[in-house]
Structure formats: C-alpha cells, structure tokens
A protein has these predicted regions:
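Short beta-strand segments
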Residues: 58, 145-151, 197-199, 235-237
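Flexible, glycine/proline-enriched loop segments at strand-loop-helix junctions
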Residues: 117-124, 164-175, 204-210
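Glycine-rich beta-strand-to-loop/alpha-helix junction loops that act as flexible
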Residues: 200-201, 234-241, 273-274
Length: 280
C-alpha cells in the first residue's frame, strides 16, 4: 500500500491534502511519504527474515538527505554508484559497513574514499576494474572486499532499454568468463573476495527470471567453493515492477518465498537492492 490516494478528486498523502501543502510551501513541491518508505522497506526486510540479509536502498533512485536519514534509522544498507552518493549516505547517518559500491566507471578518488571509510564491498564490473582497485588498495596499505557483478545471460522479460542481464547487455562479467576472473582475483594481494552480484533489469513483473539467474549463480558458487574460493555474500539486484496500467508484479513476500527454497543451502548473507520505494 502506498499512502497516496484521491478523495473527491483531490490527491492526499497520509491524509494530508497535497493542495494544502502546495499553498503552504509553494510550488514546485516534492512530497515524500514516510509511511510508504517505511512500509516498503519493512516488506523486504520481513520477507527475508530467517536468512542473514542486508536490504540496500539504491541511492540513485533518490538521494534526498531526509530520505536517506530515514532509511539509515531503519537500519538499511545502501547501494551507491559514485563518490558523491557515498558522502551523502555518510552525511545522512548511514553506516559505511552497510554500503556496497556498484556501477561502472568508478574513479580512483572514489575508490580511495570508499576504502578510507571501509565500506562493505565493491561490486566489480570488469577485470580491468579489479586490477585498478587492487592497485589503489595496495597504495593505501589496505585490502578491498569485492563482489563481482556476474551477467547471468538471463532474459528479464522487461523493456529492452532497462534489461541488464543478457549476454549482449554491457554490464558485468560475462557468465562464461566469471570462473576464470574469480581465479585471477584470488591471486591478488590486496583483494578479499566475499561475494557475487547480479542485476538483471528493472520493472520486473515475473519471478522466473530471478529464479533462472539465481540458479546459475548458485551453480557457479559451488564450482568456486570447490576450488577454495568461498562466496558468503550474494547480492540479488533487479527491480520488482510497479503498476503503471494492468501489470501485476509480484510482492516482496512472493519473491522471497520463491527464493527461500533455493537459498536453504546457502550459508552466507543475502543482499538485495531496491529502487522503487518512493514511487506513489
């Protein structure tokens, strides 16, 4: 439930008329519902109860400091894609230990800043980025915790412009190359491999793509563990859809229920990133 509704043709947020807020504060005006944010965050958190987990808010969705502060007080993790987002999360009270650094094109100064505050991990997009992080960590006398973004080559059945998990999409390490890249990373002095990450797309209205991607990742994790490369952090990205017209996207509880059976044998932390919390 979103706490926005129409009453006699007027839009209300948490029983407050938007027109009254506009008259009081002027326009343009952005109105966020605290009750909606809290409800949606708790929906994911509760759905994953029983398994060690970290619910991460994708800061690119809305980096308003008040929104970030609310989520920090809930105990949320944060998925960032820039040094600026890192600073905003910290300024808003977020814990560095709950931050994962995703995204392509991480700059050297951004990597340094993230290492300096000891974030949870980097979601590494490529072999080249891996070597860059190793070099920077070494120059700082630190070890970088990393998770590779693996492209599982799964059709998310969403709009092609927001699909990110197919082989032809330009994100992450190709599934066919992932095992080799993990082996290379395991030899680097300033790298600590902790996890595996994937993001298959946005506005997902079916669960089957998630399940297909998870099955592929779990099979890869078993191969790596047999080689002494332990994966204890699994980051499942991709946005559950919202209703624009007649879509019926799965609820977080339905999503989690579908995953639990497959995750029963995984003894690490499950991280999930979400971006749709602020949408009315």
């Amino acid at each position: 439930m979103d706490h926005f509704e129409y009453k006699q043709g007027e839009l209300y947020c948490e029983d407050v008329a938007i027109v009254e807020l506009a008259e009081k504060y002027g326009t343009p005006l952005f109105v966020y519902s605290r009750a909606t944010l809290e409800r949606h965050w708790h929906a994911f958190d509760s759905a994953l109860a029983g398994h060690d987990h970290l619910v991460c808010y994708a800061v690119k969705a809305n980096s308003n400091l008040a929104v970030l502060n609310l989520l920090a007080r809930l105990g949320s993790g944060f998925d960032i894609v820039s040094g600026g987002e890192l600073q905003r999360v910290l300024q808003a009270g977020g814990r560095a230990s709950s931050i994962v650094f995703s995204g392509v094109g991480k700059q050297a100064n951004e990597i340094e800043a993230a290492l300096d505050v000891d974030i949870h991990c980097f979601n590494v997009e490529s072999e080249q980025e891996l070597y860059r992080i190793n070099e920077i960590a070494g120059s700082m006398g630190k070890t970088a915790r990393i998770s590779f973004r693996v492209n599982p080559d799964v059709d998310a059945k969403t709009h092609p412009y927001i699909s990110t998990g197919l082989k032809e999409n330009k994100f992450g390490v190709a599934f066919a190359d992932a095992e080799s890249v993990y082996r290379q990373a395991s030899k680097l002095e300033h790298i600590d491999i902790i996890g595996m990450d994937c993001h298959i797309g946005s506005q997902l209205t079916e669960l089957s793509p998630y399940i297909d991607a998870l099955d592929r990742l779990l099979a890869l994790i078993e191969k790596l563990r047999a080689q002494g490369i332990d994966i204890n952090h699994l980051d499942l990205g991709g946005g559950l859809g919202i209703r624009y017209r007649d879509e019926e996207p799965p609820l977080p509880a339905e999503w989690a229920s579908a995953l639990h059976e497959r995750l029963a044998s995984f003894d690490g932390t499950i991280a999930v990133s979400y971006t749709h919390l602020t949408l009315p």
